Swiss-Prot record:
Catalytic subunit of the molybdopterin synthase complex, a complex that catalyzes the conversion of precursor Z into molybdopterin. Acts by mediating the incorporation of 2 sulfur atoms from thiocarboxylated MOCS2A into precursor Z to generate a dithiolene group. Residues 25-37 have a biased composition (Low complexity). It comes from Emericella nidulans (strain FGSC A4 / ATCC 38163 / CBS 112.46 / NRRL 194 / M139) (Aspergillus nidulans). The keyword Transit peptide does not apply. It is found in: Cytoplasm. One of its GO terms (cellular component) is cytosol. Keywords: Cytoplasm, Molybdenum cofactor biosynthesis, Transferase. It is an enzyme of class 2 (transferase). This is Molybdopterin synthase catalytic subunit. Belongs to the MoaE family. MOCS2B subfamily.
Length: 195
């Protein structure tokens, strides 16, 4: 992925102009809470500038029919490729991202027989040690829940319109797509990344 272009002279925003709604933190969280299928499986999808709550995520997917509830928190590490990280910053195309999250969660319900799906992604600055994504799923049994949660996470990183800027302690920064690396942190080859 190429770096984002630098603003052209004269294109800077006037501080008194309002931000577009997709960049204005006061218009968030952007949420979609809905159900899937004839049995009304609960789906909660969220983009937010606020701290993520694991408890809230588990409350959304827990049910009497769920014998297994899986929770994943993705947190900001203090290094990336041996460079000390100051923070991450995320941006998104919210309307498209929520549409993608809805499609992914609906696919997961069908594919793994899940009883509930909760996906929340932070936007803006996320300091070291704080969560940038939470995925929670409920299912009748642990096998479906484990596989479903991992599948949801990997597909979210691959498909959803959220971009990450890594800001380093030395002052440098890099824009990245989440799909550039696999679940073990290894760079994907072009062949692996062709979709």
């Amino acid at each position: 992925m190429s770096a984002r272009p630098e603003p052209q002279p004269g294109s800077e925003r006037n501080a008194t102009e309002p931000l577009p709604s997709h960049l204005d933190p006061t218009t968030y969280p952007r949420t979609l809470t809905t159900t899937h299928g004839p049995t009304s499986i609960p789906l909660h999808l969220e983009l937010t500038y606020h701290t993520l709550s694991p408890t809230t995520a588990l409350q959304h997917v827990s049910s009497p029919s769920s014998g297994a509830n899986i929770l994943f928190l993705g947190t900001t590490r203090d290094t990336f490729d041996d460079r000390p990280v100051a923070r991450l910053s995320y941006t998104s195309y919210p309307a498209l991202a929520l549409k993608s999250l809805h499609k992914i969660s609906s696919e997961a319900v069908e594919k793994f027989g899940l009883n509930g799906v909760y996906i929340a992604h932070r936007l803006g600055e996320v300091p070291v040690g704080e969560a940038s994504i939470v995925v929670a799923v409920g299912a009748g049994h642990r096998g479906e829940a484990w596989r479903g949660a991992e599948w949801v996470l990997e597909v979210v990183k691959e498909r959803v319109e959220v971009w990450k800027r890594e800001e380093f302690v030395d002052g440098g920064m890099e824009w990245r797509e989440n799909r550039e690396r696999d679940g073990f942190g290894k760079l994907k080859t072009k062949k692996e990344d062709s979709r």
